C-alpha cells in the first residue's frame, strides 16, 4: 500500500511485517446489549502476542477482498458469529501504533448472546465495561495486545459515535 492506502503490489504477509510495510486490516468491536465490549484472549499458539487480551476480532484483508467481507469472515472464523450487518466506524491510518496497517474499524452492536470462540484462535472471551478495560490498561498493560491499547488511546472502543 502507498501512503494513501492504494495497492502497489502483492507480497507475502511475513515479508510485509518484516519490512514494516503498510497493509490493510480490519478490527471488529462486538458490544453487548449493556454496552460492554467483548475482548478475546488470543490462543497461545498464535505467532504474535499469544495469550494476550485483544479486541473482539481482527484480521488482514487479502488482495481483492473488501474490508467488510474480511470483517464478517473473521467474526465467523474466530467467534462463530454469523453477522449480516456491521457498522463501519472509521479507517485508522497506517502507523507504528497500528502495526503499519490501514485498519478499517467495524462495530457489531447490541449482541444478546455470548460468542463461542474457536479454540484454535481464541482461548476465551468476556464482555467488559469501559471502566474494567480502563483498569486493565492502567494496571495490566502487559497482558493486552498493542492494538487494544492503541485503539483505547485513540478514543476507541468506547467513543462518542454511539455504538453502545
Language-model features, listed with the residues they occupy:
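Acidic, metal-coordinating catalytic segment for phosphate/diphosphate chemistry
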Residues: 1-27, 33
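Residue-level structural signal for beta-strand termini and adjacent loop
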Residues: 13-14, 43, 67, 121, ...
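Short, solvent-exposed loop/turn elements at beta->coil junctions and helix N-caps
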Residues: 14-17, 90-95
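A glycine-rich, hydrophobic loop/mini-helix early in the fold
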Residues: 25-57
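The catalytic Nudix box helix
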Residues: 39, 56-89
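Nudix hydrolase/Nudix homology domain
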Residues: 51, 90, 97-164
Amino acid at each position: 500500500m502507498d501512503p494513501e492506502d492504494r495497492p502497489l503490489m502483492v507480497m507475502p504477509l511475513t515479508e510485509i511485517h518484516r519490512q514494516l510495510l503498510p497493509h490493510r486490516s480490519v478490527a471488529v468491536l462486538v458490544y453487548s446489549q449493556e454496552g460492554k465490549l467483548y475482548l478475546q484472549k488470543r490462543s497461545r499458539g498464535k505467532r504474535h502476542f499469544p495469550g494476550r487480551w485483544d479486541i473482539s476480532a481482527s484480521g488482514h484483508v487479502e488482495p481483492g477482498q473488501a474490508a467488510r467481507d474480511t470483517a464478517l469472515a473473521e467474526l465467523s472464523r474466530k467467534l462463530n458469529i454469523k453477522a449480516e450487518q456491521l457498522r463501519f466506524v472509521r479507517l485508522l491510518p497506517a502507523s507504528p501504533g497500528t502495526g503499519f496497517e490501514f485498519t478499517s474499524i467495524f462495530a457489531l452492536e447490541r449482541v444478546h448472546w455470548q460468542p463461542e470462540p474457536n479454540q484454535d484462535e481464541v482461548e476465551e472471551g468476556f464482555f467488559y465495561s469501559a471502566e474494567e478495560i480502563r483498569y486493565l490498561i492502567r494496571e495490566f498493560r502487559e497482558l493486552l495486545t498493542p492494538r487494544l491499547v492503541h485503539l483505547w488511546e485513540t478514543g476507541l472502543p468506547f467513543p462518542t459515535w454511539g455504538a453502545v
